């Protein structure tokens, strides 16, 4: 079967790899000159099953209200007259009920455990290198109430098979000595030793190279204009505009891996994805050979901040 994968980020490239592994003829379309050059380019670098509590939970609503009007808020909402944002916001509120949060944690943990296992298998099969470290992820808290809430969330995750354990402030420093300078400010933490970290951009580029060797056709520098409707919701093809000009690309199946752009592409077909974009900021800092920077990946849940050493 011929499959067109739209988007060459970490999700699209990984999808293309496994499709090729199962015998499909795969073409990948992306507007960038290389794979992994947008959302997958610079992120927190965590393989974090422990980050399984959804943003939509009963405790986030008071926090959002406290953060309203603060430009330095860890989670900043910019409301505007956008029906898509309003619809997404209402669905978000509906998922903040305790029962739904528990159900969603169960689903996220199951998916994340499977995803991490597949990543480990892929690493063993291919020897792919992406600066990965297997030193776990440590969530840290300076607020006692936030620590107590996190301990309850960790308990729920343990019920579903994740090794996330509450730890004292002293234990946080034992796990990551770079925290010694802020030990007196720590209320405690949660540590998941099975979690990992790594460079998503390097992983995606390396896997794209492996996929090309398996016959996957990557068409870079090619814009995706629209999906062309056939009968009903059937897709007759995708209109692309690349170095050779416009072309109607046809396939037996299409994988949409365009992140927050996916709803825009699918909306003309009457398919409405409940996806709304979130923006984060990333800084990459070079380290010297004697740097005392953390070696364990850290998550500051209160400030929505992560640190990973590559």
Where in the sequence are the language-model features?
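Conserved SAM/SAH-binding loop
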Residues: 10, 221-225, 243
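N-terminal Rossmann-like FAD-binding beta1-loop-alpha1 element of flavoenzymes
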Residues: 2-28
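Active-site substrate-recognition segment that forms the wall
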Residues: 43-51, 55-95, 180, 224-235, ...
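Glycine-rich Rossmann-fold phosphate-binding loop(s) that bind the pyrophosphate
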Residues: 7-9, 31, 36, 258
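Glycine-rich FAD pyrophosphate-binding loop
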Residues: 21-41
């Amino acid at each position: 079967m011929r499959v067109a994968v739209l988007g060459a980020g970490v999700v699209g490239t990984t999808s293309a790899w496994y499709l090729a592994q199962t015998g499909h003829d795969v073409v990948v379309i992306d507007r960038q000159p290389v794979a992994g050059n947008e959302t997958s380019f610079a992120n927190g670098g965590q393989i974090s099953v422990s980050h399984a509590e959804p943003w939509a939970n009963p405790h986030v609503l008071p926090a959002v209200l406290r953060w309203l009007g603060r430009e330095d808020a860890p989670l900043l909402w910019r409301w505007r007259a956008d029906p898509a944002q309003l619809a997404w916001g209402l669905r978000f509120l509906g998922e903040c009920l305790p029962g739904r949060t528990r159900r969603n944690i169960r689903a996220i943990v199951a998916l994340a455990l499977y995803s991490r296992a597949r990543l480990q298998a892929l690493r063993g099969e291919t020897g792919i290198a992406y600066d990965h470290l297997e030193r776990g992820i440590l969530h840290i808290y300076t607020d006692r109430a936030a620590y107590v809430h996190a301990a309850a969330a960790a308990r729920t995750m343990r019920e579903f098979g994740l090794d996330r354990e509450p730890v004292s402030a002293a234990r946080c420093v034992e796990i990551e000595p770079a925290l010694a300078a802020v030990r007196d400010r720590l209320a405690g933490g949660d540590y998941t030793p099975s979690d990992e970290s790594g460079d998503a951009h390097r992983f995606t580029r390396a896997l794209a190279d492996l996929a090309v060797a398996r016959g996957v056709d990557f068409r870079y520098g090619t814009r995706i204009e629209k999906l062309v409707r056939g009968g009903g919701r059937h897709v007759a093809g995708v209109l692309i505009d690349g170095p050779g000009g416009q072309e109607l690309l046809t396939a037996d199946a299409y994988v949409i891996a365009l992140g927050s752009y996916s709803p825009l592409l699918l909306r003309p077909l009457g398919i409405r994805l409940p996806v709304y974009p979130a923006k984060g900021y990333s800084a990459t800092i070079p380290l010297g050979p004697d740097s005392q920077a953390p070696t364990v990946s850290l998550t500051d849940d209160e400030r929505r901040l992560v640190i990973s050493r590559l």
